[in-house]
A protein has these predicted regions:
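A conserved mid-protein helix/loop that constitutes part of the nucleotide-sugar donor-binding site
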Residues: 19-23, 204-227, 241-244, 369
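Glycosyltransferase donor-sugar binding loop
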Residues: 41, 179-180, 209-211, 233-247
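Membrane-proximal helix-turn-helix segments that form the acceptor-binding/catalytic region
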Residues: 121-153, 159, 164-165
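Acidic anion/phosphate-binding donor-loop and adjacent secondary structure
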Residues: 162, 171, 178-196, 381
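A short, well-ordered alpha-helix in the C-terminal region of glycosyltransferases
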Residues: 192-195, 339, 346-360, 372
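Aromatic "clamp/platform" in nucleotide-sugar-dependent glycosyltransferases that forms part
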Residues: 264, 283
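Short hydrophobic beta-strand element within catalytic cores of glycosyltransferases
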Residues: 300-310
């Protein structure tokens, strides 16, 4: 098949959506002709796929750039491709992948009566919100008759999509992320990784991977850190805008010197190998790829429960992970982390069971599931 990928930022150092699209494209490129249309690409050279850079004359406001990207890619890919696979808000693309909660759901949830009326008025008077509202609805056009397929990266996201858009009920395919490899770290791996990243060799290191740390639970982690012994440090990996704001929060809590920023990582395995535990007290994640990746590297995980994190729909508390009922509860988080120190056998059990579970979810399987959907869509067009 000749496949076009639409993704504004095609970079494995981006968030989960970006890493998902890159991994699937690289897997599919082994068997198909894959073309990627994006405004920015990562530093790594193309791995079997052909890049097409889309100019961005107006990167701000973002909604105008979104319309520009949709219009440009629609013109470039309207013919010559069996599948146009969009990870963006666009009316074009016979396969649409949703990575985040629907805008319509987020704007109107828990709003009734006059509060709902006021929100609708706000939408109607905002070009930005109207653009996103329309673009999102356009992604579902044709799904009822099989001319278009819709994918969700988790079962909870599928349920929310079908609740928000009844036309998609029973039509959304769930294809969860995978991992490239599942090799547990060794003690020597941890020593080497800490040395390479300039991290202390003897400390207890909790890891947070995030480009939006506050939404991923940094505030709770900072307060939890203050409840833990001084040996605990928090390693933060990712693009951290306005780091001073987070430092001020940590300084107020008396833990500033225990925050270790290592920035974005080309290969997160170094960070996973260096840490003792992954902490993911996220406030909103439709899946949580970093949780799966950490497990694949043999790292025990503390993660938010539903409805905060989609991957928790597949996990059992105390088996593959420690699951937090309330991601804003710092004492609960601190207790979970200290439990791993006080009960090393439980820590090892979590790492072992989590690793075994993650090893069953590969990018190869994910790509095969995509192929099945692509074949179904192309067959419906004949």
């Amino acid at each position: 098949m000749r496949i076009a990928f639409l993704s504004r930022h095609f970079d494995p150092q981006g968030g989960g959506a970006e890493r998902y699209s890159v991994a699937v494209a690289e897997e599919l490129a082994q068997r198909h002709e894959v073309h990627v249309f994006a405004q920015t690409f990562g530093s790594s050279p193309p791995n079997g796929w052909t890049p097409h850079k889309i100019p961005g004359p107006l990167r701000r406001p973002r909604w105008v750039n979104q319309l520009w990207f949709a219009l440009t890619t629609a013109w470039l890919t309207h013919r010559g491709f069996d599948v146009v696979y969009s990870h963006e808000h666009s009316w074009h693309g016979n396969v649409q992948c949703f990575h985040v909660l629907p805008i319509r759901y987020s704007l109107l949830k828990n709003r009734h009566g006059w509060r709902k009326a006021l929100r609708i008025l706000k939408i109607l008077t905002s070009p930005r919100l109207l653009a996103y509202w329309w673009l999102e609805g356009a992604r579902l056009k044709g799904v009822a008759n099989g001319q278009r397929a819709v994918l969700a990266v988790s079962e909870p996201l599928r349920m929310t999509l079908e609740q928000t858009y009844p036309v998609a009920k029973g039509k959304v395919h769930v294809i969860t992320p995978g991992v490239s490899s599942a090799v547990p770290k060794s003690a020597q791996d941890q020593v080497s990784a800490r040395a390479a990243l300039g991290l202390p060799l003897q400390a207890r290191l909790a890891l947070l991977v995030a480009n939006d740390p506050l939404r991923k639970g940094l505030k709770t982690l900072i307060h939890a850190l203050g409840l833990l012994p001084p040996e605990w440090k928090l390693v933060i990996a990712g693009h951290i805008p306005a780091a001073s704001a987070y430092c001020a929060l940590a300084e107020d809590a008396g833990v500033l010197e225990r925050l270790l920023f290592i920035g974005p990582q080309q290969d997160l395995r170094w960070a996973y190998h260096a840490a003792d535990v992954l902490t993911h007290p996220t406030l909103e994640d439709t899946y949580g790829m970093v949780v799966l990746e950490a497990m694949a590297n043999g790292l025990p995980v503390v993660v938010s429960d539903l409805p905060y994190c989609g991957i928790s729909a597949e996990l059992s508390h105390g088996s593959q992970a420690l699951v937090l009922q309330d991601p804003t509860d710092a004492p609960e988080l601190a207790q979970a982390l200290q439990t791993l120190v006080d009960q090393p056998e439980r820590m090892q059990q979590l790492a072992t069971l989590g690793h075994a579970w993650a090893g069953q979810k590969t990018w190869s399987q994910c790509a095969r599931a995509h192929e099945a959907v692509f074949e179904q869509v192309t067959a419906n067009r004949r």
